Amino acid sequence: PTVSSLVGQLYEPGDRRLDSAYTIFYMGVNVGSFLAPLVCGYFGETGNPQDFKWGFLIAAIVTVLTVVLFETQKNRYLIGPDGKPLGIIPDARKERPQADNTARKSAHANGRTMRNYLLLALLAIALAGFFYWCFGDDWISIGIFTACIVFPVSILLEGSLTKTERDRIFVIYIIAFFVIFFWAAYEQAGASLTLFASEQTDRVILGWEMPASWIQSFNPFFVVILAAIMPGVWGALGKRGMEPASPTKQAIGLLLLSLGYLVICLGVKDVQPGIKVSLIWLTGLYFIHTMGEICLSPIGLSMVNKLTPIRFASLMMGIWYLSTATANKFAGTLSGLYPEAGKVKTLLGYRIETMYDFFMVFVVMSATASLILFLLSKKLQKMMHGVE
């Protein structure tokens, strides 16, 4: 099982603390995200690109230590509500008895399975051919986009799913689609925003110039702070019956992402070429983006855990992260629109000549996705069948 799904198994189904639990888990993840750019930037930004190899070595060492820590301590801390260790065999008692077990054992089960495999194989071949026509021999894109469709379809073909389970899985798929737009804009942090920090941001503080890579630590620093606050906020709203449903929280996250880019648009508007903008604009962007991330990412992990039948817990968590992989690929494409002197780039007829034009792409994209998700929230809540 994935670590993300293990967090959900620490609680009973329907436990209202799950959103807060995933937020705390997310805070822990971002402690590492905060330290990594500082360490790698310290060893790597020496003027010699080859020195970044030490960053990879440090990452490998820490990964090995993490695996050792997990394996030696899991039986002590990963204990479910019933007192049993987690991550071995799914406890069927935790799953609501909605599926008809006799249907799973029907005489047609084997034939249906073979038919499903054949359909999935044909679908994969057809999609791979279509994406090859779209992207040429970009096999990474072909693989990611094909998997993003084939794996979700494979779960829907499962004959044991009830209508309620199918509806809940559809909710995950729909929100995962919108999450692609969030991460495609958000992950400019590792591409165009880092380039912007390096080339067009004044990073001098009291005579000392901050390495551009260190700005990557702003976001996880804000995550750790806000993640300590948000569980209390959601808990207080829940006690008053005012806590937003998961789809609404996701829409709020997208809206905050759009507002963050609007802030940086104000910072770069009418700035003359060669003039660097204040670091405060980029700091404001990262702070607002972090608020959006806290509303969307840990809540999304919690939602997947709450809506997924336990027999598909790890697979559905993988599909959720597959949407992030798609978003990162999309983010790379969008970062290619970064303005260059003497070049005019376009997106759907929109001309991109300045940083203002570039950042407005993400303002509009995120705001549009947020508005549509807000409009769909009520319908999605009904499809969740009582899960909050």
Please give the residue ranges for each predicted region.
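Intracellular loop-helix junctions on the cytosolic face of multi-pass helical membrane proteins
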Residues: 13-14, 41-194, 199-204, 234-240, ...
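C-terminal ends and interior cores of transmembrane alpha-helices
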Residues: 252-274
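Glycine-rich segments within core transmembrane alpha-helices of 12-TM secondary carriers
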Residues: 17-38, 44, 58-66, 121, ...
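Transmembrane alpha-helices of Major Facilitator/SLC transporters
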Residues: 144-156, 208-240, 253-261
